[in-house]
Amino acid sequence: MDRLLLVDGSNLLFQMFYGMPSRIVNHQGRAIQGTLGFVGALLKMIRMTCPTHVAVLFDGEHANERKDLDADYKTNRPDFSQMPEEEIPFSQLPDIFAALRYLEIPFAETEVCEADDWMAGYSLQYGSDRQVIIASQDSDFFQLINQNVFVLRYRGDNSQLCSAKYVREKFGVSPDRYADFKALVGDTADNVRGIKGIGPKTAASLLEAYGDLEGILSNAQDVPKKALREALLEGAERLRINSALIKLTNSVSLPFSLEETVYFPKNLTTREVLTEIGVLQSR
C-alpha cells in the first residue's frame, strides 16, 4: 500500500530549534541548530515510516479566517518582531528550504489558510486507499485518525505512532469526536478557551451521553447537574466558535498533486545533506 508522509514543517522547526543546544554554529558562525535538528529528524522519520510519498508543509506569516472568528486565537504565541535574528526559528528556514530542494521533497508555505488545513485536505482526499502519516506534535490532528491515517509524534527513539486506540485510551473518545472533545475542554496551545468546569472526564462523559457537540447543545437544558447545565447554556456560542476553530475539513486547495509528492529514497546522512547545501564544511 502507498504511504504518504505529511510533515508539519513549522511544528518540527520549533521542536528542533528549541530542543537542540542553542550554541550550535557552523564554520561561518551562523546558528544552525534548527536546521541540523530538522534535517536529521526528517531523514529519521523517512527511515521509520518508509513512505512512497512525502510533503512538508509550513505556516506562512499571514492572517487567516480563524483570527476573524476569534481575535484571541494564538495570541499567546511569542512575538518575534523584537528578538535578535539568532533567537528566531524562522531565520533558519532558508537553509531548511535548501535542504528540502536538495532532497527533492516538495514543500510549501500557506498564504490564506493554515498548514493544518492542507494536511487535513490530503488526509481526507487520499486516506481512503493509502496510508497517511501526519508527523506533528499538534493534537488537533487526532481528529483525522482512522484505519489508514495515523499521527507520528516524533521524539527520536521514543517516537510514537498514534492510532484510534491511542486516542480512545488517552481521552475516552473516538477520533471522530476529538474535535468536539477539544471544543469543550479548550486548547491552551492555541489560546482557545474551554467551558468553565468541563475537564477531560466530563467532556468524554457528555459525548458518550449525547453523541456529539450538537447533541450536547440540543440537550443542554436536560443535563442533570445544575452547574454543568448552566455552563453549557451560557457557553453555547463559545462552543460553536471553538468547534469552527478546531475542526479540520477538506475545504482548501492543495499545493501539490499526489503525483508531485512521490518520494525517491536518497540514502543520505544529515551531514551529507548539510555539506552539499553549504551549511557545513566538507571534512
Where are these regions (language model features)?
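Non-catalytic nucleic-acid-binding/docking modules located in mid-to-C-terminal regions
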Residues: 51-55, 105, 148, 161-283
